[in-house]
Amino acid sequence: AALVFALDDLERVGQPYWGAYGIAQHGLAAMVGMLHAELASSSVRVSALQPGPMRTGLRSRAYADDNDLQAREAADYADACVTLLSSAGAAHRGQVWKVRA
């Protein structure tokens, strides 16, 4: 079994004006480490995926003038998600996998 969490870029959301969202993301990152330690002797793998910028409906509403050419379609990160959920995800156990599609 695998628990996989999605994380934003912690360095970016740790900056001024990110408020509750930034705090929540840092808390989630801490929880990944805690759960990994608590479940280390079990068959449950804990990891997180930190994708790069994604083109989503939420992003287009939050950043109406966004011209980020590095932003990718969410589907571009599907293979990384499948990897973490499969037995191959054992290589990333307890880690935050920073993926750039």
Feature locations, PLM:
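Short aromatic-enriched loop/helix-cap "lid" or pocket-rim segments at secondary-structure transitions
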Residues: 17-18, 58-61
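Residue-level recognition of the N-termini of beta-strands and the immediately preceding loop/turn
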Residues: 1-2, 44-46, 94-95
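Hydrophobic structural elements of the Rossmann-like NAD(P)H-binding subdomain
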Residues: 4, 46-49, 59
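Short, local alpha-helical segments
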Residues: 41-42, 61-65
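C-terminal helical subdomain
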Residues: 48-49, 56, 64-101
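Catalytic loop of short-chain dehydrogenase/reductase
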Residues: 1-41, 53
